[in-house]
Amino acid sequence: MPFNGYQTYYRIVGDRQSNKTPLVLLHGGPGSTHNYFEGFDDLAAQTGRPIVMYDQLGCGRSSIPDDDQLWQAAMWVAELRALRTYLDLPEIHLLGQSWGGMLAIIYGCDYRPQGIKSLILASTLSSARLWAQEQHRMIRLMSPVDQSAIATAERLQDFTGAAYLTANQHFMTQHASGPITADDPEFLRRSKRVGTTAYNVAWGPNEYNPTGTLADYEYTDRLQYLQMPTLVTSGTDDLCTPLVAKTMVDQLPHATWTLFPRSRHMAFIDENTAYMTRLRHWLAAHD
């Protein structure tokens, strides 16, 4: 898809001629690519529902411009709006995971789009400040060695040291994803162009130091504007802690929360069968 002089890669599975409302997926990061969403292909095959996923500008098979001024929420919202127009998607279900959920919240609250039949907020957040607080709370549960390495990196603002990188990997494996093994699906093992610059400029050096263009992201008080049925999903060991999830649920007018007991930041990977069953029922109920 042409967008602002660049190209946005999109992928559609399922039956576009189906009478079922398309599901549009917004990946995390920024910069994480659509790849992990290929785990939704079976849902499309089983139900016929069209599912649209895409690589947001700055990663994957989309253009990766060398322009740090681009990495703003407004640009990614414009890309989403352009995608809906380009693919003629007047009515959709919208699922955003992590940063993708932030994008969905910004889109819904600030632009009041028409035709969103339901919203699925997967392991996401409404407050960068609360998110950072909760990540630091979980860091305090790590080994003294890892805590010290992270604290030193934060004090020096140097996130390149070996001790820090090891500690951060421990944190992310505990609460996000990985390690990838030969037993994982091909779409997880496949190499991809991660949007490192988009992530660093828009968010920051890691999950617990939001210092980028999204550092002032505070939408908890605006969630009241999301009047569509909303499903919040998260895992018990998630970066999206139960407090982060409940903070959203308490402010959303029409929210339901499903907490997956054996999942981290990507419940649709860690508990794929349970997640897809829940999602299939949710979508059918809100078509």
UniProtKB/Swiss-Prot annotation:
InterPro entries: AB_hydrolase_1, AB_hydrolase_fold, AB_hydrolase_sf, Peptidase_S33, Pro_imino_pep
Record carries keyword Protease: yes
Keywords: Aminopeptidase, Hydrolase, Protease
Catalytic activity line of the entry: Release of N-terminal proline from a peptide
EC category: hydrolase
Active site: S98 (nucleophile), D238, H265 (proton donor)
Any matching Pfam family: Abhydrolase_1
SUPFAM superfamilies, A to Z: alpha/beta-Hydrolases
Entry's Gene Ontology cellular component terms: cell envelope; membrane
One BP term from GO: proteolysis
Domain AB hydrolase-1 per the UniProt entry, residue ranges: 22-271
NCBIfam families the record matches: pro_imino_pep_2 (TIGR01250), ProImpepLactob (NF045945)
Protein name from the UniProt record: Proline iminopeptidase
